[in-house]
């Protein structure tokens, strides 16, 4: 009886720890979204589509386009395709998705209150956002850095020449602190022009209310496309910060974060092993076990298909690549050198080509 009593006490203690721990971890998440197994995935499956939060009017990354003469609207861009990849893996349909426009203020609010399932809006992974805001950052999909854009009429070639300049930036991002640190380090005086998140900083710059505009360099290149005179604006050479950008999900929902995380890794792995949307069907019944695992062809008790561990079908990763493409395809068609935005891959190459993109083994 004494031993039995100890067992009961131990079980109660374990349950209490689990409950308290779960509450502490999810303290900034609406109680409705504290998962038993994966509340987000269950809700997504029940409704039949993913809700993705993204920016609007962000050429190359996320923008609602009018297609053809029929006036059909369709979201396009790098961040948009990342969300489509999630839908393709879950439903076998990249269009099983709804896009919710977010800004610097609402993006985290919408994620934490359950308005959106995943945030794909050029969001920088930082310590504070991860630890304090209880956000789960997915693998970095775009390695960036903050820079500056100016009018060529100023005749400058470096941010260090901008003594006394008016510099505009969004009040809701990482730009303000980066700019403060940079100009303090170089002992340069400047006039900060903080733009609230419900306004677009690029419009404040275009109106002439500031001399220089600071944000991620990919954002500068994208926003310059929307200017009526893009050739009259210069992106300066300085890169003043690290800005690892990627998708974000709610903290504490392990199954959902695993699905989104391995969706990103599937894009990297497919490029690494040579699979793309055009050739993937030719790799059926291939002798390479790595390709067999990716195609969902290893079955049986010893080698169950890997999708089963996520609650997905055997062909989840095949569908991602067949229907959306690998990382290289997504990058090149949206922001690559042959697009209007014209961004070289740089750090956003696979590690095998000198970049920072690297996925754990799919095994």
PLM features per residue range, with description:
Residues 10-20:
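Bacterial N-terminal signal peptides
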Residues 24-26:
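Boundary at the C-terminal end of the N-terminal hydrophobic targeting segment
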Residues 28-35, 41, 152-156, 160, ...:
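Extended ligand-binding regions for polar small-molecule ligands
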Residues 28-120, 312, 323:
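Extracytoplasmic small-molecule ligand-binding "clamshell" domains
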Residues 40, 82-83, 106-111, 198-205, ...:
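Short, hydrophobic alpha-helical packing/hinge segments within bilobed ligand-binding/sensory domains
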Residues 51-60, 72-90, 124-126, 144-200:
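Bilobed "Venus flytrap"/periplasmic-binding protein-like clamshell domains
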Residues 86, 111-112, 162, 204-208, ...:
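Hydrophobic residues within well-ordered alpha-helices
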């Amino acid at each position: 009886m004494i031993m039995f009593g100890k067992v009961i006490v131990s079980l109660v203690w374990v349950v209490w720890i689990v409950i308290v721990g779960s509450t502490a971890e999810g303290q900034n998440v609406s109680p409705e979204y504290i998962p038993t197994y994966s509340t987000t995935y269950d809700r997504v499956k029940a409704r039949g589509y993913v809700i993705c939060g993204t920016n609007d009017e962000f050429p190359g990354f996320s923008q609602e386009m009018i297609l053809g003469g029929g006036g059909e609207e369709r979201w396009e861009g790098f961040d948009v395709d990342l969300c489509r990849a999630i839908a393709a893996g879950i439903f076998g349909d990249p269009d099983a998705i709804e896009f919710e426009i977010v800004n610097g203020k609402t993006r985290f609010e919408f994620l934490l209150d359950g308005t959106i399932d995943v945030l794909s809006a050029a969001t920088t992974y930082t310590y504070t956002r991860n630890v304090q805001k209880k956000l789960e950052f997915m693998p970095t999909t775009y390695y960036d850095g903050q820079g500056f854009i100016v009018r060529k009429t100023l005749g400058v070639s470096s941010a260090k020449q901008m003594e006394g300049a008016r510099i505009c930036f969004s009040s809701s991002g990482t730009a303000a602190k980066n700019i403060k640190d940079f100009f303090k380090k170089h002992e340069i005086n400047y006039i900060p022009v903080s733009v609230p998140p419900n306004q677009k900083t690029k419009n404040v710059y275009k109106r002439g209310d500031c001399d220089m505009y600071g944000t991620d360099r990919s954002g500068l290149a994208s926003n310059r496309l929307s200017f009526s005179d893009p050739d009259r604006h210069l992106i300066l050479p300085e890169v003043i910060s690290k800005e690892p950008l990627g998708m974000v999900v709610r903290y504490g929902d392990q199954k959902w974060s695993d699905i989104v995380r391995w969706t990103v890794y599937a894009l990297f792995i497919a490029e690494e092993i040579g699979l793309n949307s055009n050739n993937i069907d030719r790799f059926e019944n291939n002798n390479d076990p790595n390709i067999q695992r990716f195609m969902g062809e290893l079955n049986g008790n010893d080698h169950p298909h890997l999708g089963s561990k996520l609650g997905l079908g055997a062909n989840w990763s095949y569908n991602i690549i067949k229907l959306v493409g690998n990382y290289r395809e997504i990058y090149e068609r949206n922001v690559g050198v042959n697009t209007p935005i014209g961004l070289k891959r740089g750090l956003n190459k696979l590690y095998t080509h000198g970049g920072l993109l690297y996925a754990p083994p799919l095994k």
